[in-house]
Amino acid sequence: MTEQVKKRPSPRRRARECAVQALYSFQISQNPVETVELSFVTDQDMKGVDMPYFRKLFRQTVENIPSVDSTMAPYLDRSANELDPIEKAILRLAVYELKYELDVPYKVVINEAIEVAKTFGAEDSHKYINGVLDKIAPALARK
């Protein structure tokens, strides 16, 4: 029997994971972006993280929350306020990437969101996130 070698997440995956955690903290605490970012970077192990991408994702997602939320609202089965905070953070980040980071292929955005949901979300949240993003991508002409 062979052992599977667990692959380290890519620097961009780590940036997405950290951005989701920072977004979660921002949503819960309502502290200023700068405070959340500084606290997060100070308190977390940022080794192997694409720091410029982390900062861009976190700051730009927060800056674009109204646009991101209005984009995803028609595809949710409940209001954004009723979503689990981790699911909301993952969806916000992914919708931001789908809408504004056009150099990132939509399949990569969706797959990364699913993987982050498997790591941080509830048992079946990755299925919910996949379903929502799979509907949003074509609406943004990303397919």
Swiss-Prot record:
Belongs to the NusB family. GO terms for biological process: DNA-templated transcription termination; transcription antitermination. The keyword Cell membrane does not apply. The keyword Transcription regulation applies. This is Transcription antitermination protein NusB. Keywords: RNA-binding, Transcription, Transcription antitermination, Transcription regulation. The lineage of its organism: Bacteria, Pseudomonadati, Pseudomonadota, Gammaproteobacteria, Pasteurellales. It comes from Mannheimia succiniciproducens (strain KCTC 0769BP / MBEL55E). Signal peptide: none annotated. SUPFAM superfamilies: NusB-like. One of its GO terms (molecular function) is RNA binding. Involved in transcription antitermination. Required for transcription of ribosomal RNA (rRNA) genes. Binds specifically to the boxA antiterminator sequence of the ribosomal RNA (rrn) operons. GO terms for cellular component: cytosol. Pfam families: NusB. InterPro entries: NusB-like_sf, NusB_fam, NusB_RsmB_TIM44.
